[in-house]
């Protein structure tokens, strides 16, 4: 089965072809037009997707060495994301599917991230043998879920204010690192001292009594931003510049420690022996190494996507579509067009999907 996946939920325009479970192509174009604005401008993102979508899809099909008529299924992100950006890929995909007489599969962007560690062209590809805890962490989302083999899941924790990726970008902006700042903080942190300053770790065992913490898997990063701003205002610019790497390491440590602590605690509480980490922040080297070390200490198996599949990409959309079909979550014979895009992630906090 040949599946074309299309992803346009934020500022990456991507198309990929999956053939019988193997990635044949994965073309990603990251928009650079937002740098001067310090964040993604929704209208600019939509216009860039409109400008690039045809050439990106054509490139993915060409690299896969197939013809459009060889496609069996077309899938695209239906949300969550910037609604105008989502609509570009969704409408294009539905139109192409209709024109070719092929079934269309709408995919939840966050769910695609959850299963991205299992994209089948990874070296040493493997999957959990049972249920697992998923940490999905990006610029827009920070979710902790317990995932079942039938693709159902229960969200047990989410951010109550800012996402972890947003915390990286906004604190980095305060340090004058530009946008996106996450990768720059990661690079600087390797040269800095994470013990230079201890920024707050909200909603963790170290920040409150064990009784109030137990079972609380929500996240909060707004206090970290405030703490960083307060620290910067109390020190002159020369001192800040001198210790930029130390500050980056301290900020990264504060974010990573929370993510790791809650993920491992969730796995132990729910008695699962596997954790997956996905989303753009899963590319962070500090998170990868700290999560691996914590999992090793507790005998938990760790699954993280290859770097190419950590950030937004269409291979994960095509892979999710394949899983939905294979595991009975989507029936091709029930195919319909005119799917409504959605901006926000809607998942029940209690009860399985």
Swiss-Prot record:
Binds 1 Fe(2+) ion per subunit. Required for the formation of a threonylcarbamoyl group on adenosine at position 37 (t(6)A37) in tRNAs that read codons beginning with adenine. Is involved in the transfer of the threonylcarbamoyl moiety of threonylcarbamoyl-AMP (TC-AMP) to the N6 group of A37, together with TsaE and TsaB. TsaD likely plays a direct catalytic role in this reaction. Substrate binds at residues 136-140, 169, 182, 186, 284. GO terms for molecular function: iron ion binding; N(6)-L-threonylcarbamoyladenine synthase activity. InterPro entries: ATPase_NBD, Gcp-like_dom, KAE1/TsaD, TsaD. Fe cation binds at residues 109, 113, 312. It catalyses: L-threonylcarbamoyladenylate + adenosine(37) in tRNA = N(6)-L-threonylcarbamoyladenosine(37) in tRNA + AMP + H(+). This is tRNA N6-adenosine threonylcarbamoyltransferase. The gene is tsaD. Keywords: Acyltransferase, Cytoplasm, Iron, Metal-binding, Transferase, tRNA processing.
């Amino acid at each position: 089965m040949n599946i074309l996946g299309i992803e346009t939920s934020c500022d990456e325009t991507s198309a990929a072809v999956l053939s019988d479970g193997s990635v044949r192509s994965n073309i990603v174009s990251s928009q650079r037009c937002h740098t001067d604005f310090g964040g993604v401008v929704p209208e600019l993102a939509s216009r860039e997707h409109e400008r690039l979508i045809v050439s990106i899809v054509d490139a993915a099909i060409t690299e896969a060495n197939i013809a459009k008529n060889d496609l069996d299924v077309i899938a695209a992100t239906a949300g969550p994301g910037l609604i105008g950006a989502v609509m570009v890929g969704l409408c294009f995909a539905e139109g192409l599917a209709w024109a070719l007489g092929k079934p269309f599969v709408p995919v939840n962007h966050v769910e695609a991230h959850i299963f991205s560690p299992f994209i089948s062209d990874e070296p040493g590809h493997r999957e959990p043998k049972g249920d697992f805890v998923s940490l999905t962490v990006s610029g827009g989302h920070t979710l902790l879920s317990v995932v079942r083999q039938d693709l159902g899941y229960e969200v047990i924790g989410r951010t109550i204010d800012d996402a972890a990726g947003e915390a990286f970008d906004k604190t980095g902006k305060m340090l004058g690192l530009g946008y996106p700042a996450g990768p720059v903080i990661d690079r600087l942190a390797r040269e800095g001292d994470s013990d230079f300053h201890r920024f707050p770790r909200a909603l963790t065992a170290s920040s409150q009594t064990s009784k109030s913490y137990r079972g609380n898997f929500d996240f909060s990063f707004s206090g970290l931003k405030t703490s960083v701003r307060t620290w910067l205002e109390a020190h002159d610019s020369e001192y800040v510049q001198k210790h930029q790497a130390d500050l980056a390491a301290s900020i990264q440590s504060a974010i990573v420690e929370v993510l790791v602590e809650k993920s491992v605690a969730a796995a132990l509480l729910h008695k699962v022996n596997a954790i997956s980490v996905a989303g753009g922040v899963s590319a962070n080297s500090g998170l990868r190494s700290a999560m691996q070390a914590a999992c090793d200490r507790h005998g938990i198996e760790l699954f993280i996507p290859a770097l190419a599949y950590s950030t937004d990409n269409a291979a994960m959309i095509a892979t999710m579509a394949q899983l939905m079909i294979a595991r009975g979550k989507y029936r091709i014979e029930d195919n319909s067009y005119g799917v409504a895009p959605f901006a926000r992630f809607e998942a029940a906090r209690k009860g399985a999907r």
